[in-house]
Amino acid sequence: MFVKNFIHKLKELKQKSLDKFANLLYDYGGYVYDRPCTFIICSLICCLLLTCGFYFKEHEKDIYKLYSISNSYAYETNETINDFFYKSRRCFILVESNVNLLKPKILRELQKFEEGTKDIEVDLSEINECKTNSELPPEQSHVAKELYKTLIQRSEENLKSGKINGSLFDYSDLDENGKSVLSLAGKENNDDTLIEGDNKNDEETSANNNNNEDDNNEDDNNEDDNNEDDNNENDNNNNNEDDNNNDDDDDEDNEEEDEEKQKSLREKLYRKIYEMLKKKKENIVLDENNPNVNFTDYKDDVFYPYQYIPPMLIKADRCKLQNVFGDKNLNIDLREASDGLKKQITYTLEDICEKKYGDCNFSSLFLYYEKGNGYIDYPIKVDNLDFYVNRRTYKEMMFKGILGNMVYEKSGSKYIIKSANAIMTVIPLLNSHTYEPYALAYEKKLIDYVRFYNLDDIIQDEETNDDNDPFIRFHVFTDRSLEDEVDRISKIDNLTRLLLLIGVLLIFMYALFNNVTSVLYRSKPLCAVMGIFCGFLGFLSGSGFLYFLGVKSVPPAETVPFLVIGVGVDDVFVILNSYSLLFMVKDNKKRIQMCLKDSALAITVTTLTNIIAFLISAISPFYSICAFSLFTASSLFFGYLMVLTFLLSFLCIEAKLEKKKRNIFTGTFHLFRSIFMKSSKKNKKENKENNIHDDGDNDNDEKKKDLSLEVKNNEDDYENISIYEWIHNLYLFEESINKKKKNAALVYASNNGMSSNLNNVNEDGFPNPSKIVSMEDVKKRNIKKDDAYINKEDEEGGGYYNKDDNKKKDILGKKQKKNNNNVTLVSKKGEDNELDVYYENLDEKTNDKYKMNNIKSSKLKYDNDKKDGAIINNRPSSDEEYKEEKDKNKINILNDVFNDITIKPNENILLDRGDVIKSSGYDSSYNDLQSSSLPNPSSNEVLNKTTMVYNETDLKDNKKEIKSSKKNVKDIKKSDMIHDDTYDIINSNNKNILLSSNEINNNSNNTNKFNNNSTELATKDTQQFINGHDKNIYLLSSHDNALFYKYIYEEPKGNIGKYFRSLVKNYYVPFLSSRFGKTIVYIMFTIIIAMSIYGCTLMKKGIKYDKAFPVDSYVRRFTTAKIKYFPDFGDFIEVYYFDKHFINKYRGLEKNTKEAASSFLYSDLTDRQIMNSPKINKNVHWENTNLQEELINMHNTLESQEFVTSVANGFTFFLNKNKSSLRKENPQEFYEIFANWLKKDFVGNLFKNDFVFLNGKLVAWRFHYFQKNVDDSEISSKWLKACKQITKLENHNVQMVCFHLSSIFNETDESIIEVTLINLGITILTILVVTAYIIKGFYSCVIIALIIFLIDLCIFGFMCLCGITMNIISMVILVLSVGFSIDHTSHIVQAFSHSMGRTRDEKMKESLHLMIGPVLHSGLSTWFVISTLFFSNKDFTVIFFQTLSLVLFFSITFSSMFLPVLLSSFGPLH
């Protein structure tokens, strides 16, 4: 009971809030109507202010932030690697040709080209990171500064003491505590290799270190002065922590967990005590997240090699040249230097490249020729293609990675290389924090140098291997290439601007096509144009607002204006559709208010659902999608506000023009007419008189066809009806006029005896077709076009009402004004007290002549009351009497349409008035149909006869229906048109068919099934008539019929959407409501759903990272060439091991601890949770033989993978070389052997920089492998998952991390399905809750949810069938599909639930009639504006177009076809 009451109260609250919101919109519409210009100016001013945010626009260039998952390890791993390992910046130069590049002539030119890379000069004005307003370097913590100075001093002491000779290091014996003391063996070697990261010779390194130390001394002294008391105060508190930290390595795993918990509690306690004692938080130098970090924890740490310094500690100001180029003695701060000075100082590759043996460590073909090892004029001869060493320079080479499409032959132990079509050169640059901006500037110059280098003249006469013209192409790829191309696609280039303009032009034409009609003053071209501008202004306002807040632009945001404009125009169609359907409301202000009340709620719901969908996407773990969703949601919101202010104001302006029967071009027309066509006052006066006498001579064509009725009583009742009532009454009226709307036209009656009618029937017992009274016969008898006859009637005393738009008074005797009317009533009192009624149809095709088509109706009997006669001939003395008398002569529209046809009194006939009109051949397209009221059927008076008015067009249309009237009478009988077994064929004689009341009463039971069972249109007159005669006949009063025809049935010409609605009503709705149509729809969508399910089985996920760049990008050309010529040397994958104690300890030195962003939509169980486990990567005993065996097995397993070509693992090389010496599992012996191998072995020397030792333990190491070049996102995305699984050694709690630049895409590929499904689920549930607040009934929400599910299923399946892979772009479109599908679906379901139909079929017809127009137009308009994206040069925009096209197609087809059929079968009836 409580739940029931709660639900009831909730429904009441919902209804009250909706009513309140609707009333608020109603009042707001009137407020805007009174001051539209004010709203236009205010909205434009606000939009202009928000657009100023574009001044603060920034582009996000960090590719890791753009494409990585926020809470997975790709971004974190990259940060960790950069903090503890030095990585080179590699520049790749690939030369491809269809000629042999190893010919001496070509090789010499290529050698000059390579030497040119060393001669590139870069001036310091190219350093963008050191501009005047550039940011200062991040400030280090006090402990980090102290540790950095200590490590520098220790390195200098080792240099002075002679411990370091060259670059070979050695381990001394381990001490008693198990800690190794690093020393040097003093081996003679000319290797000048430097410490990794600096890559300078020892003297340069020492100089740089001294400079860095001197620069930091002043800052350190200041910090010491300010914080000396703080550090002293915390020394005692940190002593216990120091002891605990030193003992962590010896604890067991369970003890470590307890110790960590206790440590965290102590840290919290110490922090509180510290803050209470100090009371000055701003003076705290220690990291707030680690208040117990102390220098004593780090001062005794010893690294191997001695010169190793964690990169995270090197934070020297890189804008000071003495920190970068110490050998140049330049004491210049680039932030303060002038541009002229910057341009005078240059540097070359020699200053920023990684060096080996004193030279830049190139990987190049020309290393083979150094120091006379070979000659260009002779073929290349090597003993190993995988690994070759120049015996004179000791520089290693991998010919399979240098020469592409290599052709060689084996001669003994030598390989003779004869030809190659591609040459790869790799230039390594320094990648430390200090050198990064200078390397970036050089890479920019290098890219320009390589891309525009040309050697076509050298190879013109060379023989090709493909019989095509010879060519030679230069490709380049650097670390900055990714950021540059991401930045380029983030900006709107000229092609995108052109596509946007074309898209706007297309949607502009489509909007005008749907909103401009033949009657210009009813057209709404201004609203169509301003609707497009509303979307564009919404984009400017929404994006500017986010730029104000500091949100950076991302590549997908480039499609936002296309999307927002397309969606914004949808609201225009909904509003104008509602406005056009309220044509019965004559008060423009009221019409605007009712329009806003009906439509604004719908567009509010659709806009809200779209915004919710994008906001939910904004919490996805992908930053680029998050930013894109924010931009779209913000733009849609401001676009919605612009519709309710800017667009509504222009609609009010055009509504006022429509009332004056003017349009936006009227002012211009009058201006030109006043200049070139000045008329005299006399002409104006004559024109005025002509307007009075000529009965509307200057009216437009639409006005000529309106029905002229002097009826105003109860018009407010028709103006206050809702759109749903209008459409319901329209279909009822259609049903009463043409109940089945078939092709036959027949009226028959039965006599008392069948024998008297035998001549009128055929042998089958059906009426003889030759005796059928067709509509053509009626017109031949009734239509008269003789103007002279009409004039004669006027001379004999007849009167007529003349129309005048400006005055309300009698003119020329008996002429009276008729508003909005071009059909005049001519009455004459003739003989036998009969009243002749005529209808004049003014056909004004010329200005000086008008024609009247008059139809003389049947003579109607009436009482000889003088008061009745005075109604026509004489105007009463008072207005009230005139009004009352006029009401008695209301014109009935629904009377019989046959002339001279009567029903004989004794015939057993049941006549439904709707069937009579239907059988007469009358169609709803006729404009003017009038007749008089029937008298009381209980009397024997003659029934009213039919008066009909036709114009030439109607006559032509009617001929088509008459031709189809020859349908078999048997079919007509099945259609309930034959009411009896006997027939009396009605001939063309002027007989009266009389129907006695007795027979009507006797046959009342049989009559009920033929009468209209609807009472929506019943009035007092009809109710009295029905109640008095057992409700056998259902009629409207003459007044109601006239008003109904005027206000409901006949849409005015030029009404927006009129012809489209007529097509829907006359063709589409009958097809969809038929059994055949429903069967076709069910079969078609069953096939579509089955294909979608099959398509889901073909799903592929992922996107190649080069596809994220434009089609014309040099990155894509480089990648294509690399895949072609070097298939076995694809991505260079790095695998890292980090000791968790080491990582956590040194990360505590950072003043601001980095916290990875997270999203609850995704959790990587294989990475984050495992790496956070307290057991992982702690206290690993590398001397354990079992662990060593697992490492070897891991290496073999990885090497056997299909995507791996070669593995370079220094650890396994060491284990295989010294396997017999490592069986004792002695730590001291293990590290001693390891040191000797790194020092003495040539292979070990190559891997020396891959290992980091701290205090006698291996705390970090890495290895590399190449994987195959595969242009398949599904295959390439598997490597990351496989690598993580293979490098996981569970038995020893070892988990390594695999990394490559493409991993930011690959890990996204692995998680995209999970994220998409979660995102879709949350979006659907949230939107359904919002929709349920608006839509009536729980059952309707279930149907909406089902349709959304089917739409998404079809989109997902057909994406796979079309070859579109699942990636972050297609994911956001799938989420967007929920918004689109809920828009279109909710429009139909809401119209269905609010419709007043008696059956599901009727409700379906009414809902389609009302809303299929806005649904179809909104989808097509959106598609037109995005269609131009197909021609974009960026893959993600093409994917956006393809996916969104599927979304729009299935959303429209399901909403306009499957959903109506489903509702007609299972929809909520109440």
Swiss-Prot record:
**Residues on the Extracellular side?**
57-493, 550-554, 620-622, 1099-1300, 1362-1367, 1432-1434
Q: What membrane topology term does the record carry?
A: Multi-pass membrane protein
- What is one Pfam family matched by this protein? Patched
What protein name is recorded for this chain?
Answer: Niemann-Pick type C1-related protein
Which segments sit in the membrane without spanning it? 4-34, 664-673, 1058-1073
Family annotation (PROSITE patterns): SSD (PS50156)
Q: Which reaction does it catalyse?
A: cholesterol(in) = cholesterol(out)
Keyword annotations of the record: Cell membrane, Glycoprotein, Lipid transport, Membrane, Transmembrane, Transmembrane helix, Transport
Q: How is activity influenced by pH? A: Optimum pH is 7.0. Inactive at pH 7.4 and 8.0.
Q: Which organism is it from?
A: Plasmodium falciparum (isolate 3D7)
So which residues have sugars stuck on them? 78, 165, 294, 361, 1218
